[in-house]
Amino acid sequence: MKGTFPVNKFRELETPFYYYDVNVLRETLSCINKEAGKYNNFCVHYAVKANANHKVLTIIRESGLGADCVSGGEIRAAIKAGFPTNKIVYAGVGKTDWEINLGLDYDIFCFNVESVPELEIINELAAAKGKTARVAFRINPNVGAHTHANITTGLAENKFGISMEDMDKVIDMTGTLPHVKFVGLHFHIGSQILDMGDFVALCNRVNELQEKLYARQIIVEHINVGGGLGIDYAHPNRQAIPNFTEYFATYHKHLKLRPQQTLHFELGRAVVGQCGSLISKVIYVKQGTNKQFAILDAGMTDLIRPALYQAYHKIENITSEEPMETYDVVGPICESSDVFGKAIDLNKAHRGDLFALRSAGAYGEIMASAYNCRALPKGYTSEELV
């Protein structure tokens, strides 16, 4: 089963480009609000790193979600899209002074602190402004997620966060730093997680830490468990919206919050992944010695995930209904890794056919590069192409 696309409109546009189905996006956001809304103390932030397209950000902001940012540029993009600054959280292992100052100037909700030196610098910069920064400590829980090695973030060997062993020392430090206020704990174990058992393991580790803090008569304002919920790359038409019911229910069941504590989430891929497709044109169909190649005008510069993570994206020939043939689908970049899929069965391809690379709404347009001096792909919403 293929997706439904405004092919006639596509033919008027220069390829490659990203296409965002805002109906899918809005249905996804509605489901998030419905399921998270079952629990009074759940707050959801959108992980801007997944897709910072201004039109996409604006729709997400209109839904009421907050913003999870990992750079000063993302903070600016969120503010430009209208996100309230008191719903912006800021994480990242390498926050620079200007980025910290930007967050301080806008009085963002919280800095998720990842090291002792960072905590000291935030205190110093806040003091210079006569402000007190709200901080949560990103704790590395040493929980392994069942996902690609390059997108696990919660193991002791990863660069992210403060070790559980150092948590007490860092908390004690806040008592000596008058311009930071310790308000929360932050976690994030990885991305594209489909096994709810990984989130249960995180809940158990958070519960352990909460008990340790409670023994010291410390109860933080909020717990932030990050995001990580994956999407169904194999069946974007059958399962466009992730199972948010099970996701939020898992945390409600297994995480032991204290009275008045709020639970924060940072969802990215699960919000935008299925609403986006990369649309590309077939330049040539080339017969090799043992295989056929469908050579597209899109390459790894436009969608790097297959080359970087060996990620699968469903590929559809959206302008052909001819019998199936088998192709290696490749791009024009001067790299052997510029391959979107090998031995893919597709409707017979001809020069000028349009291919859709599905489930590309997350970590697609945002990760595009100008390698080979190529132009960056544009992004269009379904509302623009009516």
Predicted feature locations:
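A charged N-terminal "starter" segment
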Residues: 1-133, 172, 176-181, 211-218, ...
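Short beta-strand segments
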Residues: 47, 134-140, 186-188, 224-226, ...
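Short acidic, glycine/serine/threonine-rich loops at helix termini
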Residues: 57, 80, 100-105, 122-125, ...
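Charged (often Lys/Glu-rich) extended helix/loop segments that serve as interaction or gating elements
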Residues: 3-4, 250, 260-386
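General structural feature for long, well-ordered alpha-helical segments within catalytic domains
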Residues: 21-24, 28, 32, 52, ...
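Active-site loop/helix belt of alpha/beta enzymes
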Residues: 142-284, 346, 372
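Short, glycine-/Ser/Thr-/acidic-enriched flexible segments
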Residues: 24, 51, 74, 95, ...
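Hydrophobic "anchor" residues on beta-strands that sit immediately upstream
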Residues: 45, 134, 222, 262, ...
